[in-house]
Curated annotation (Swiss-Prot):
Produces ATP from ADP in the presence of a proton gradient across the membrane. CDD domains: F1-ATPase_delta (cd12152). It is found in: Cellular thylakoid membrane. The lineage of its organism: Bacteria, Bacillati, Cyanobacteriota, Cyanophyceae, Synechococcales. This is ATP synthase epsilon chain. F-type ATPases have 2 components, CF(1) - the catalytic core - and CF(0) - the membrane proton channel. CF(1) has five subunits: alpha(3), beta(3), gamma(1), delta(1), epsilon(1). CF(0) has three main subunits: a, b and c. Belongs to the ATPase epsilon chain family.
Length: 136
């Protein structure tokens, strides 16, 4: 028994295949999905989706969206997604360091659109870096 996983972004079908287990980065924490899971709809945070299939793990960086689980089918609709195996680890690390520097430079300043955008960029850079490092 296995799951069918589909990860869809507006510009591409990121993943469409079978999975033994899926770990989703929901807005309330990591959510593990196995065959036979109850139906649910959840918000997806910026983070890394992990897929166990064929004895190995794959990672996908997600940039927020929604996931639906129904009858062993997991459908993830996201704003943007990237397979961990296609992300250059050195570039992802450099982007993370750059985003960290920007956020650190804004610390202590009042809330502003610039500060929110910088934090979003940091979260996205972190997800890409983690997905690149955990790709098999």
């Amino acid at each position: 028994m296995s799951l069918t996983l589909r990860v869809l972004a507006p510009d591409q079908n990121v993943f469409d295949g079978s999975a033994d287990e899926v770990i989703l980065p929901s807005t309330t924490g990591q959510l593990g999905i196995l065959p036979g899971h109850i139906s649910l709809l959840t918000a997806i945070d910026v983070g890394v989706l992990r897929v166990r299939a064929n004895g190995g793990w794959n990672s996908i960086a997600l940039m927020g969206g929604f996931a639906e689980v129904d009858a062993d089918e997991v459908t993830v609709l996201v704003n943007q997604a990237e397979l961990g195996s296609t992300i250059d680890g050195n570039t992802a690390e450099a982007d993370f360091q750059k985003a960290t520097t920007v956020v650190d430079g804004l610390e202590g300043q009042p809330a502003s659109p610039e500060k929110v955008k910088a934090q979003q960029q940091l979260n996205m850079a972190r997800a890409r870096m983690q997905a690149s490092k955990s790709a098999d």
